[in-house]
Each structure stands twice: as structure tokens, then as C-alpha cells.
Amino acid sequence: DATITSISFVSAATAAGTPTNQWFALYDSSRNLLRQTADQATLGWPANTLKTVNLTSTYTTTVEGLYYIGIMMKATTPISVHRRNVGVAAASLALTQLAPILAGASSTGLTDTAPNPAAAITADDSIFYGYCS
């Protein structure tokens, strides 16, 4: 078992411009919400910066397997998230659409609370850099 206390993501070249809501969330493989961070609301997030936010309470894993972490920012200019493209766009997108989908967009129109469960994931050809600790 592992105890998770926080989630981290790294911003890329675009800093947050006038954020109104921002949080991270932890989901199981069925996209059921396990924990989330408090809404960081209007706190700034500079470009090229690691941001670590504590969960509202710790989570201890009880099963091995796939977990998802999510990031949400509502802002006039959301950050760009540091990510790595998987490869040639057409070929890599086809690969990333194989189950289980490991990265992509999910629920939309969010503000201060993570959805439970999160919507189906639309695959992306790049992987965001984020982790739990």
C-alpha cells in the first residue's frame, strides 16, 4: 500500500493569467474520484514551475493498478502543462487511443469541485508531466 498526500504538475512556457479556479484530483481506473486538492482559486502559477498541492486528506491505495491524476484550471489564460509528445502525431494518436487511455481531456465546464465520476477520456498524443507523492 502507498499513502498519497499530494499531486504535482509542471507548467510549461505559459504562466497562468487571472486564474479563478485550479485544483488537482486523484481518480481510480474507472474515473471515480478518490481525493482532490482544495481549490487554489486565484493563486498565481508562473511559467516553467513545479506546483505541488496537498490533497484535502491523504489516500492510501488498497489495490495495485492504474490511477489517474487530473488537473483543472479556469483562467483568462490557463497554463500550458509540461508534456511530452508520444511520437508522430497520426501514429501516436492511434496508439494512445488503445485501452486503457493514459492521457487526454475529460470533463469540461468545471469550477471548484472535481467531478465524480470524471467523463470518458478523449486521448491525446502527448503525456502531461505530473505525479503523486
Where are these regions (language model features)?
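A short linear-motif detector with a strong N-terminal bias
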Residues: 2, 46-50, 105-110
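A short beta-strand element within beta-rich, extracytoplasmic domains
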Residues: 2-14, 69
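Ser/Thr- (and often Asn-) enriched beta-sheet segments in non-cytosolic proteins
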Residues: 3-8, 52-54, 58-60, 80, ...
